[in-house]
Amino acid sequence: ATIDEKTGVYNNKFFRTISEMELEKAKRGESLSLLILDIDNFKKLNDSYGHLIGDKMLKRLGIVMKENTRKYDIVSRFGGEEFIILLPKTNIKRALIVCERLRRKVQQDNEMIKYKVTISGGLTTYQKNDSVKRMQIRADKALYQAKKLGKNRIEIL
């Protein structure tokens, strides 16, 4: 199985396989960016409205992400309320545009607006001799910065 049942996006196992293939292309000079994002205050959302609403928001986020990324972008669940998106053929400038659009779409989504759902993201791009793991570590640090700086934002590292 390649799809995460709760969210409708790719699962982590599929992401690991496909990301290694995309990394090889990046090593040959193609642009590659990576975004880790999560739902802000997800625990509070679950505590306030219950897990059914939390699950519904995860599913809705999956839909919004798929609708607002290109067909060759790899949208996957990273775990919990965290998602990871691989953006092939995308430099950091273009990736930031994609990420900001996604952040705004979530904030304005009719189903999510009732629960004040927002997302924060950490963005990075391939650097010489990178591994997927190194890219994930940088994106995760950038996500932590976005949370620390007030949430509902994208940070780059």
Label the predicted regions:
Residues 22, 106-109, 146:
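Signal-transduction coiled-coil helices of two-component systems
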Residues 16, 20-23, 136, 140-144:
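Short, conserved alpha-helix that lines the donor NDP-sugar binding/gating region
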Residues 138-157:
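Catalytic/regulatory signature loops of cyclic-dinucleotide turnover enzymes
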Residues 46, 50, 54, 79-82:
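Conserved phosphate-binding and hydrolysis motifs of nucleotide-dependent enzymes
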Residues 18-49, 65, 76:
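Active-site-proximal structural segments of metal-dependent nucleotidyl cyclase/transferase enzymes
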Residues 1-17, 37-51, 59:
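Conserved nucleotide-binding and Mg2+-coordinating catalytic segments in signaling enzymes
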Residues 47, 51, 88-92, 111, ...:
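Short, conserved catalytic or interaction motifs in soluble domains
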Residues 60-134, 155-156:
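GGDEF/GGEEF active-site signature
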